[in-house]
Amino acid sequence: MRLSALPLLLLALLALGGCSKYRFDTPQSAYTSFHEMVKRGEIKQAYGVLSQDTQKAVAARAQALKDVSGGNMKSEPYELFFMNSAQPADVTEITLVREEGDVATVRVLSSGQAREVRLVREASGWKIDLSDSLKP
């Protein structure tokens, strides 16, 4: 009797292990997870990988657009953030440039071009921080 339950238990453990394919324990893994979410069209989840400051800035812009439209615009901040975004190019390399406390910078090589991305560590892990680029 006990032996027949073992395969079901193993199957359940394998299924649970596959649920968490995204990682946020390092700046590189957080960026990789964010990139994968965007590529898969998982924009609501990808929005959750943005830092709290970035989400606040996007929400403020979304509210300003709603106010200007007289309340006719019904889009959520995450929808506005990713609206008209092209499919991201494949990333060929992600390198940690620096990590100082809860702030890190990674160098992302994509389509032969490199750019630096800032990340911050929050309670749930590393997050993409674009708040400086969203300032008016």
Tell what function each PLM region has.
Residues 19-23:
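Bacterial signal peptide processing site
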Residues 7-15:
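Bacterial N-terminal signal peptides
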Residues 83-136:
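Exposed beta-sheet edge and beta->alpha loop/turn motif
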Residues 10-11, 34, 95, 105:
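Exposed boundary/loop context
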